[in-house]
From Swiss-Prot:
Its cofactor is a divalent metal cation. Homotrimer. Divalent metal cation. Substrate binds at G81, D82, M83, L84, R103. GO terms for biological process: regulation of RNA metabolic process. This is Putative 4-hydroxy-4-methyl-2-oxoglutarate aldolase. Keywords: Lyase, Metal-binding. A divalent metal cation binds at D104. It comes from Thioalkalivibrio sulfidiphilus (strain HL-EbGR7). It catalyses: 4-hydroxy-4-methyl-2-oxoglutarate = 2 pyruvate; oxaloacetate + H(+) = pyruvate + CO2.
Amino acid sequence: MEPAAYGLTATADLCDQHGEAAGVCETHFGDYGGITAFSGEIVTVRCFEDNVLVRQTLEAEGRGKVLVVDGGGSLRCALFGDMLAQTALDNGWAGVIVNGCIRDVAVIVTLPIGVKALGTHPRKSEKRGEGAVNVPVSFGAITFRPGERVFADEDGVVVLK
């Protein structure tokens, strides 16, 4: 069965059905969006304390995709906030997973979009435009590859090829 046919299948069920073929992210994320279960085709951004490429990517049509941001696990500033959450929602993104921090949680939690992150930080990021888009990114003992499908819910994050 094609991964797209799973829709919002629970991550625990995907692990039971696919065993070792289901890649489980070992990073423990908090849920910050108004939706806690989401899935979609992976689009990636690799950046460090600089969210210019995150903004540029979310300004494109999302078509139900999920943006996976590898911020290097930095807890020193936010890579995503309420304005980017609204941009993602307006452009049809299903969700955003940030290996780093976000801010403006009081607003983001009211929006119907999935958002997972390591934590929160009130400081905004730099604006240098450094990083890479649509490259494999690795964290939490898993690699997220553009075009694969990611599933996220209260139990965690799972990738199916």
